[in-house]
């Protein structure tokens, strides 16, 4: 475990070690597939951001069985951070993938319904500003490109931005290529997330099996 990082993702693991491990496994798995190298950055940002919301004292206390309020939930704020970090072409898919990485991806427009998502991030924003912003800036420094976590929190605290995102999801149309990309990166994130905790490495077969194996099976 990296001694300079105090925030944890799991009781015995630092947040930094976990998300960088997930990133490395997902990218290694993707490289093995030898498809779409142009989405490397998309995969990397999704993996690095997927547990951002664990960087609150609410979640840290939850790991110690000392807190169980809604503020411990890391999915929604992590999804918003992913949206903020990604370029426009990947914002919506990244949001969906991260928001549902502990569940199932539903209809995109349903993911932003007011009655299904807690959009009140004020307590989490204040908590990060007061307690963990320095470490989060350190963790994400490579990816912020001159920005900082405070800029994200200020953006998140602006209600007009949240309304705009909801409107975008209601209007956006998706095609089959979007669906396949979403499912593919979602599967890489889940693979990386589980493999990092179990074996801390990607599972890469010793050899590639010929296509005839699949055709004969079918």
Please annotate each region the language model reported.
Residues 3-11, 15-217:
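Accessory nucleic-acid engagement/destabilization modules that flank
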